[in-house]
Curated annotation (Swiss-Prot):
Name this polypeptide is given: DNA-directed RNA polymerase subunit alpha
Gene: rpoA
Family: Belongs to the RNA polymerase alpha chain family.
Known function: DNA-dependent RNA polymerase catalyzes the transcription of DNA into RNA using the four ribonucleoside triphosphates as substrates.
InterPro entries in alphabetical order: DNA-dir_RNA_pol_insert, DNA-dir_RNA_pol_RpoA/D/Rpb3, DNA-dir_RpoA, RBP11-like, RNAP_asu_C, RNApol_insert_sf
Lineage: Bacteria, Pseudomonadati, Aquificota, Aquificia, Aquificales
NCBIfam families: PRK05182.1-2, PRK05182.2-5, rpoA
Description of how the protein assembles with itself and partners: Homodimer. The RNAP catalytic core consists of 2 alpha, 1 beta, 1 beta' and 1 omega subunit. When a sigma factor is associated with the core the holoenzyme is formed, which can initiate transcription.
Gene3D superfamilies xref list: 5' to 3' exonuclease, C-terminal subdomain, DNA-directed RNA polymerase, insert domain, RNA polymerase, RBP11-like subunit
């Protein structure tokens, strides 16, 4: 019986801080495409990075404004800000500040950052101030995340003047591969996989590959012990226990800090207050995005609750 072939050569053909190309050979026929596709999909969708998610410019109410004494309009300034690359560590969110009150070019290096935030491309252009009487002052919210997130899925900010942005968190700019035939002994129908990727400089190519492989292996390992169990329905919670949970703080909900902050901004402090709100009422609040709403509904479901409940009816059913 023919032995299964495993790779004998795995090496980087070229690698620097932004670009890398490596080779894996030989592989059984079809495995080049299988491995290449898996790596590419995980790299583009699941590697964490940092991005600007909202900006507040002093004196500006919306993104279609202009700023007297500044060459660019707000839309162009936002587009330029999106080109600034950040490395955010030990935190999921930070607010950065920029203030410039002299004529000249405004660069990413003018942004004030805490110790856990590094600007990768400090020479990135943001705007030009043309007037000595103009001050460009802004707050910039950056967050960690993965993939591409639309602005309506972001945590909304109730305070006036903030513009919430679409965010491309992925540090991977290009991920591509090709599969060629390679020889093992007399056979020439084995695969040679050549994979290349370009990052934005926040992560190196080898680190990105390592993270992607670890994610794939972790998922595959979970499939080594497949068992089928008929799901059992949870025992219904006693009414008095349900009523007690209604008095709990929303801090008890298994939701992200982002979703928790969104609820606090609209004045919700207890689970009882939350369950009396309908889904439409939460949707109509600019503080609650689609992602936060999904988290809230799932957390309530796990506790035996749902949105739009009539607590009065619940109490009367106990009597």
């Amino acid at each position: 019986m023919k032995e299964f072939i495993f790779p004998m050569k795995i090496y980087w053909e070229e690698k620097d801080k932004n670009y890398g190309r490596f080779v894996v050979e030989p592989l059984e026929r079809g495995y080049g495409t299988t491995i290449g596709n898996a790596l590419r999909r995980v790299l583009l969708s699941s590697i964490y990075g940092s991005a600007i998610t909202a900006v507040k410019i002093e004196g500006v109410q919306h993104e279609f404004s202009t700023i007297e004494g500044v060459q660019e309009d707000v839309l162009q300034i936002i587009a330029n800000l999106k080109n600034v690359r950040f490395d955010l560590k030990d935190s999921d969110l930070e607010i950065l500040y920029l203030e410039k009150n002299a004529p000249g070019v405004v660069l990413a290096s003018d942004i004030k950052t805490p110790p856990n935030v590094t600007i990768i491309n400090k020479d990135a252009y943001i705007a030009t101030i043309n007037s000595a009487n103009t001050t460009l002052k802004m707050e910039i919210r950056i967050e960690r995340g993965k993939g591409y997130v639309m602005s309506d899925e972001m945590e909304q900010i109730g305070e006036a003047g903030w513009v919430v942005l679409d965010a491309d968190f992925s540090p991977i700019k290009v991920a591509a591969f090709r599969v060629e035939a390679t020889r093992v002994g007399d056979r020439t129908d084995y695969d040679k996989l050549t994979f290349e990727l370009t990052t934005n400089g926040v992560v190196s190519p080898d680190t990105a590959i390592q993270q992607a492989v670890e994610l794939i292996v972790k998922h595959m390992n979970m499939l080594t012990n497949i068992s089928y169990e008929v799901p059992t329905l949870p025992e219904p919670m006693p009414p008095d226990e349900l009523m007690e949970k209604l008095t709990f703080s929303i801090e008890e909900l298994d939701i992200s800090q982002r979703a928790l902050n969104s609820l606090k901004r609209i004045g919700v402090t207890t689970i009882g207050e939350l369950v009396q709100l309908t889904e439409d009422e939460l949707k109509s609040s600019k503080n609650i995005g689609r992602k936060a709403l999904t988290e809230i509904k799932e957390a309530l479901k796990n506790m035996g609750f749902s949105l739009g409940m009539n607590i009065g009816e619940q109490r009367s059913s106990e009597v």
